[in-house]
Amino acid sequence: MKTLLTDLQHSIAQAPEHRHCHMTCEMVYVKRGRARFSIAGVDYTAGPGCLVLISPLEEHSVRALSEPYERYFATLSLPELTRAFPHSALIGVFRNRPAGFCHCVALRGAKPEADAIFDRLCREYAAHLPGARQMAEALLGEMLVLCYRACPGNFAASRSPSAARVDQVQQYIEEHFTQELTVTGLAERFFISPCHLT
């Protein structure tokens, strides 16, 4: 499971505000309290029942606005998410964001469900039981569906075949980012016009 869900914490501890980024996707779910998230130059105030979605290498900072600030913090491997949900638009909130994307989603009436999902994720993460990865995938899928229902505009519309090919290229880049890659080389590898990649 730790290849998909690389870290999961439930916390009420305060942390100093500092700008940072991760090599992984990040989900922060606010259970109680309020915090200000600054992500890619946009400020959001997240209260109880808000889910904050942050992509790899997306610079952000967090400052608690009210106590207790209780939250769940999960980091997720984007390549593993892609493997877990290979044909799903649900992971688009971390990859292919439409214009007007909002990092902070209020789950509104689904807060009790979201609380329960994160409580179960924490138990699965800590217990290392057989089938833990499959359970984590199912719970993450539920959370992303709740997010979709609360804010469908955050998810890209259906993709054309050429856009699907670009998605494959994007996944390849994410998995091979330490290697030297060129647009021309990628276009040849995936039999696609270089203009689709620029």
Named regions from a protein language model:
Residues 1-11, 59-126, 144-153:
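A hydrophobic/aromatic-rich effector-binding and dimerization subdomain
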Residues 6-22:
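Conserved short histidine dyad/triad with adjacent acidic residue
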Residues 21-37, 53:
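Short, conserved beta-strand element in jelly-roll/cupin
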Residues 36-38, 54, 60-66:
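Short beta-strand His + acidic residue motifs that chelate non-heme Fe in jelly-roll/DSBH
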Residues 41-55:
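Short acidic-glycine-tyrosine-enriched beta hairpin
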Residues 109, 125-142, 160:
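All-alpha amphipathic helical-bundle segments outside canonical DNA-binding/catalytic cores
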Residues 110-113, 161-169:
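N-terminal positioning helix adjacent to the helix-turn-helix/winged-helix DNA-binding module
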Residues 146, 152, 168, 172-198:
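Basic/polar phosphate-binding segments, predominantly the helix-turn-helix DNA-binding elements
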